[in-house]
Regions:
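ABC ATPase NBD coupling module
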Residues: 1-6, 116
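ABC-family P-loop ATPase nucleotide-binding domains
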Residues: 3, 10-90
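Walker B motif beta-strand of ABC-family P-loop ATPases
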Residues: 90-96
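Walker B catalytic motif
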Residues: 96-97, 104
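Helical segment within the ABC ATPase nucleotide-binding domain
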Residues: 106-119
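Conserved H-loop
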Residues: 120-136
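H-loop (His-switch) and adjacent beta-strand-loop-beta switch element
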Residues: 136-153
Length: 155
């Protein structure tokens, strides 16, 4: 995360006893320390959390729970997109982000990814399903088969 890389897992790990709020505060302040910045003030951090929760349609109660503990599949994926939004990485690798999501949850995740995409950020989205690509606006699509790129589409 220090260098701007974010990795989302197909099966996000649960971290019992560590609240999302504490987890994100530690991650953001570690990144800020690496960049030579002061720790984020509590009010600024809470405002950022509210903004990013709204971005991905995340219920405020999830941020008080332990990281991914007892979360549904959709909540875990939404939580990962929330983490990505909070950390604002240069490159995000999203592994099977659509796995186990219903259409509504997938739409919210796709909207979050689309809102974070700009000239200074990139995302590699790994998926086996076209449905996510219908919602995310990719610049380029590479189709891999048996470890090789067999087709490329895009500008």
């Amino acid at each position: 995360s220090h260098e701007g890389l974010f990795l989302s897992f197909q099966y996000p790990v649960e971290i019992p006893g560590v609240s999302m709020t504490n987890f994100m505060k530690a991650a953001i302040n570690a990144k800020r320390a690496y960049e030579g910045l002061e720790p984020m003030k509590a009010a600024e951090f809470m405002a950022l959390m509210r903004e990013k929760r709204q971005l991905v349609g995340m219920d405020s109660t999830l941020s008080r729970r332990s990281v991914n503990e007892g979360f549904s599949g959709g909540e875990k994926k939404r939580n990962e997109i929330f983490q990505m939004a909070m950390l604002e990485p240069k490159l995000s690798i999203l592994d099977e982000t659509d796995s186990g999501l219903d259409v509504d949850a997938m739409r919210i995740v796709a909207e979050g990814v689309n809102k974070m995409h700009n000239e200074t950020t990139s995302a590699i989205v790994i998926t086996h399903y076209e449905r996510l690509l219908e919602m995310i606006k990719p610049d380029v699509i590479h189709v891999l088969y048996k470890g090789r790129i067999v087709k490329t589409a895009g500008p």
